[in-house]
Each structure stands twice: as C-alpha cells, then as structure tokens.
C-alpha cells in the first residue's frame, strides 16, 4: 500500500530543521510531497520558484520526496494529489495551539485528512526560517542552521 503524505510550509528558506523532518517523514511514508505555499501575504524573501528550487536541491538524495509549490487550500491540494496525511512539526506548546486549529479545519474540509505531528530533533527545535533570516540580517553565523546551498542563496539575497 502506498502511503502518500504532504509536508506543507512556506520554507522561506528551508532550514536544517525542515530537512530533518522531511527526511524522517520519508522513512515513514512511501511518498512525501514537500508542498511549498505561495504565501504571498507573508511577503517571503524568496519567490515561490526560488523556494521550490532550493528545496529540490537539498532534498534530491531523498528519492521518495517530491517538491511542489501550491496556492490553493491544503485540503484541495491533498485531494488533487491523493494524499490523506499531513506531516507537521511541533517545536513548542505555542506551535501546538496553531497546529491544532489547522488540523481541525483541514479535517472539516477533508474528513479523511489526518495530521501527523513530528517533534524536531533537539538540536533543531529552536530554529525557524524567520529567526535564521534575522540572524543573517545582523551578520550572525547562519551556517549551522541551513543546508549549504540555502546559506549561499540567503547571503546573496542580503548582499
């Protein structure tokens, strides 16, 4: 039986924490779609195409991971791709509150859509794309938090 899961997010940019979760999800499910939200209302630093390209580059070794951009409701995207599992990361209690609301809304829109929550590895539990961008803007060392191609792209954006 093929189990298709979706790991959605903005991934602006994709971090080592995201990579940790998608790697672990790829070991749990037959096929994982890393679904990158357009999220234009969030005013991302990277365009959707740039985020998709970076994610494809860093997930290339994961043969059962596909990277796609999307702009529709997650429930619609899941239906279109015949997936019934959403993978989400929970870094803290504050993440849980938001994720709980999302999971319930997605289940309302698509009753067979289940949310599976993964706790990040401890060394990545404090990382977020926003925090990494803030560190980079102030000249801090971001190399421990991002895959090398992403570090290069982020530093180029800020140059």
From Swiss-Prot:
InterPro entries: Cyt_trans-like (IPR004821), PPAT (IPR001980), Rossmann-like_a/b/a_fold (IPR014729)
List of residues binding substrate: 10, 42, 74, 88
Keywords assigned: ATP-binding, Coenzyme A biosynthesis, Cytoplasm, Magnesium, Nucleotide-binding, Nucleotidyltransferase, Transferase
SUPFAM superfamilies: Nucleotidylyl transferase
EC number: 2.7.7.3
UniProt site positions, description: Transition state stabilizer: 18
Family: Belongs to the bacterial CoaD family.
Protein name, as recorded: Phosphopantetheine adenylyltransferase
């Amino acid at each position: 039986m093929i189990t298709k899961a979706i790991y959605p997010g903005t991934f602006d940019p994709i971090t080592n924490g995201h990579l940790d979760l998608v790697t672990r999800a790829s070991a749990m499910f037959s096929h994982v779609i890393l679904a990158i939200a357009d999220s234009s209302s969030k005013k991302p630093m990277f365009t959707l195409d740039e985020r998709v390209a970076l994610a494809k580059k860093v997930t290339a070794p994961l043969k059962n991971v596909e990277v796609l951009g999307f702009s529709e409701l997650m429930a619609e995207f899941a239906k279109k791709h015949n997936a019934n599992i959403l993978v989400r990361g929970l870094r803290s209690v504050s993440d849980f509150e938001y994720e709980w609301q999302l999971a319930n809304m997605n289940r309302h829109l698509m009753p067979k859509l289940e949310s599976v929550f993964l706790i990040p590895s401890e060394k990545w539990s404090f990382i977020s794309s926003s925090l990494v961008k803030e560190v980079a803007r102030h000249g801090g060392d971001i190399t421990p938090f991002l895959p090398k191609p992403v570090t290069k792209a982020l530093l180029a954006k800020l140059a």
